[in-house]
A protein has these predicted regions:
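Extracytoplasmic/periplasmic ligand-capture domains
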Residues: 4-47, 60-62, 106-112, 117-268, ...
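Surface-exposed binding/hinge segments that line
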Residues: 12, 47-99, 451
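Surface loops and adjacent helix of pleckstrin homology
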Residues: 14, 73-74, 134, 442
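Short catalytic/ligand-binding loop motif for oxyanion handling, primarily in non-cytosolic enzymes
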Residues: 20, 79-82, 265, 276, ...
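Short aromatic-enriched loop/helix-cap "lid" or pocket-rim segments at secondary-structure transitions
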Residues: 83-85, 279-280, 381-383, 450-454
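Mature extracytoplasmic/periplasmic domains
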Residues: 270-293, 445-452
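Active-site-proximal polar cores
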Residues: 439
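Long beta-strand-rich cores associated with HINT superfamily self-processing modules
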Residues: 448-478
């Protein structure tokens, strides 16, 4: 790796790293082709889940020679290389350009040609993934010959499969942990905090694109009580005092304050989690701890009912909440409280994520959902709530002027004080406008039986993916 200045970085491709199925060794041409394919700035048709994060960071990638790829930065800061090239968040594996050129786009969609210690055998959506070990792998030859990842949405079924050794590792609700520990089960080497939160989607408040400056076409559906329109009545300047902005603020405040976080932790999480109040931030982050008194939310159903009455909803309203196909006991508890205290009736959207995702990519979603993401607050996680990932990338159904401002600072500054100030400003904004309330925070990790499996090494991560299971090449059967 060679960094000339903050405008570009040259990377040398590791030699003798073969692609699966005989598609030759990886070189700079593969790297450049892949990154330019997933980057919305170089490929407007990209719908890559992670490529959308590159907006405002990576301009393009070019070939210097067969062994050297050059990354041209739009912005560069201390986190840039770590965030872009590691799998701490989601990671971006390099796929084979030769496979794409020879077999075509449709073939490579069904036949993942990568360089990892396992190669794909079969992927059946919402059912299973099968992978075989790569012998004599350049980095680490796995101890096991095959790994099967099964889609099992029911918690009780996953637990039964672990107890009967139908499965060797899996993700279980935290309330089951102690009883599993008592039976001798343990947690995988790495764990992380998981946050259950609510993104008040539909609040598309940016007027122009963060990068191009083009005017955005957005449907700000103020028929949804939680959605406000700062341009209501015309105009091009953000106005937080329009009727819908003030009414929706009261609605969001009311919903945020009718969440019995402590009871949810005790009853659903078995007291192993803790109350959580604000999206994007972990409770153990120093910035949260310095501002916890200001940003914490009371449990105040009576005050919330008064706010709804002021907003024009004394008899409540209906709202939709996307929760996907997984466990949603926590969300059900919140919905029950909203119904009994505020007469707010929740309809849960349980469709598969792959079917629902296009609505957040297209910025048409206006129903609340869990949102994303969290991690080091000096990193620019604001990409999820502004237009830097549009078109083509993920978003949480909100595009916010303060998110745009904080993102631009974090994406280019290396001044700790400036980075911290940008983080505080963003969180204060979310708190003031009640846009991203938290519910609970809990530790999360894969669970396995150490009498059957040895699993001593695992790369760290920020977000739960595949139930916290990764680094399968280090699993050994006893």
């Amino acid at each position: 790796m060679c960094i000339r200045d903050s405008s570009y970085t040259d990377f040398k491709a590791r030699e003798n790293v073969p692609f699966h199925r005989g598609f030759g060794d990886m070189d700079a041409n593969d790297i450049v082709w892949y990154f330019n394919s997933i980057n919305p700035l170089t490929n407007p048709d990209s719908r890559n889940d992670t490529g959308g994060q590159m907006g405002g960071t990576l301009l393009e990638t070019s070939v210097v020679d067969d062994s050297t790829a050059r990354f041209h930065w739009d912005a560069f800061a201390g986190h840039t290389l770590f965030k872009t090239f590691t799998d701490l968040e989601e990671g971006m594996g390099i796929f084979s350009k030769k496979a794409y050129d020879e077999r075509g786009e449709e073939w490579v969609k069904d036949n993942m040609i990568g360089t990892g210690p396992f190669q794909l055998v079969e992927w059946v959506e919402s059912e299973r993934v099968e992978m075989d070990a790569v012998t004599n792998h350049w980095r680490k030859t796995p101890y096991v010959n095959r790994v099967e990842i099964l889609f099992v949405p029911e918690n009780a079924t996953r637990r039964a499969m672990l107890e009967t050794t139908q499965a060797y590792a899996g993700n279980l609700p935290i309330k089951d942990w102690q009883s599993m520990f008592d039976m001798g089960f343990g947690l995988a080497p790495e764990s992380i905090y998981t946050v259950t939160q609510i993104a008040m989607s539909g609040n598309y408040w940016e007027y122009s694109h963060i990068k191009t400056g083009e005017t955005l076409e957005r449907n700000r559906d103020i028929s949804k009580p939680h959605v406000g329109d700062p341009y209501e009545g015309g105009g091009t300047t953000f106005n937080g005092d329009t009727p819908s902005m003030q009414q929706s603020l009261k609605v969001r405040q009311a919903l945020s304050r009718t969440i019995d976080r402590d009871t949810i932790n005790e009853v659903i999480l078995g007291g192993l989690g803790e109350a959580h109040h604000l999206g994007y931030v972990w409770n153990n982050d120093p910035i949260w701890q310095e501002n916890a008194d200001t940003w914490s939310l009371p449990y105040d159903p009576d005050g919330a009912k008064a706010l709804l009455t002021e907003a024009g909803y004394p008899d409540g309203f209906d709202i939709e909440w996307y929760v996907g196909t997984g466990d949603y006991e926590t969300q059900q508890a919140v919905a029950a409280d909203w119904l009994s205290k505020l007469n707010v009736n929740v309809t849960f959207d349980r469709q598969d994520y792959s079917s629902w995702r296009p609505t957040i990519v297209a910025r048409t979603n206006s129903d609340i959902f869990g949102g994303c993401c969290w991690g080091p607050l000096l990193w620019p996680f604001e990409w999820t709530s502004n237009t830097s990932s549009f078109p083509g990338g993920y978003g949480i159904g909100m595009e916010l002027p303060q998110s745009k401002a904080s993102f631009n600072i974090k994406n280019s500054s290396q001044d700790p004080a400036e980075l911290k100030a940008a983080a505080v400003d963003m969180l204060q904004y979310l708190s003031d406008w009640a846009l991203f309330p938290g519910i609970v925070q809990q530790p999360n990790a894969a669970m396995y039986n150490p009498d059957v499996v040895s699993w001593q090494e695992m790369r760290p991560y920020l977000w739960m993916r595949l139930g916290g299971m990764r680094s399968f090449e280090y699993i050994q059967l006893k």
